[in-house]
A protein has these predicted regions:
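Sec-dependent N-terminal signal peptides
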Residues: 4-13
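Carbohydrate-interacting regions of secretory-pathway proteins
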Residues: 19-176
Length: 176
């Protein structure tokens, strides 16, 4: 009986340990708080926070949302996303959009090599210098010299498109 009780206690602690796995890297500022949509603007209808992630319910959503956090033009942006099967969304950076989706099913196929299957978390990174971004998906370069301009005033946004989507651990670091 003691062994069973001990095992149940250990199993009960596993989800709590996973929730704490994320550690904010030095110099980064987190744009989502995992609790609500504070710090985000736009038409918030259909957007919510579920299980610590910004959730897009595409059937309810009316528009895109944008971070209210101001930043300079030379930055590193990191976030995690999870797409429902066939889902399509996007991340706006300085006014330009990178399609974020279930790449193996929805394309573009040239990104599929780096993507995890629908329903799994993917890590996306934008390293922006003087209006050009290198974009990595799960550590693999998917765009080497994406010209995005340097209009930091247009900020960071999340797109409403097709299928349910989750975003979490959205963070930014000013480059020196």
């Amino acid at each position: 009986m003691r062994r069973v009780l001990s095992l149940l206690v250990v199993l009960a602690l596993i989800p709590a340990a996973r929730a704490d796995e994320f550690k904010l890297e030095e110099g980064f500022v987190r744009l989502d708080n995992g609790k609500d949509l504070a710090g985000w603007t736009g038409n918030l209808t259909g957007w919510s926070v579920k299980e610590g992630a910004i959730h897009l319910d595409v059937k309810m959503a009316k528009g895109n949302i944008y971070s209210e956090t101001k930043h300079g033009g030379n930055v590193i942006i990191r976030l995690q996303f999870r797409a429902a099967p066939g889902a399509d969304s996007g991340v706006f950076v300085h006014g330009n959009q990178l399609q974020v989706r279930d790449y193996p099913k929805a394309g573009p196929k040239q990104y599929a090599f780096a993507a995890k299957p629908a329903g799994e978390w993917n890590e996306l990174e934008f390293d922006i210098t003087n209006g050009t971004a290198e974009v990595k998906l799960n550590g693999q370069v998917i765009e080497k010299a994406w010209k995005i301009g340097s209009n930091a005033a247009q900020g960071i946004g999340l797109q409403k498109e097709a299928g349910d989507f989750d975003y979490r651990f959205i963070r930014i670091k000013e480059k020196k």
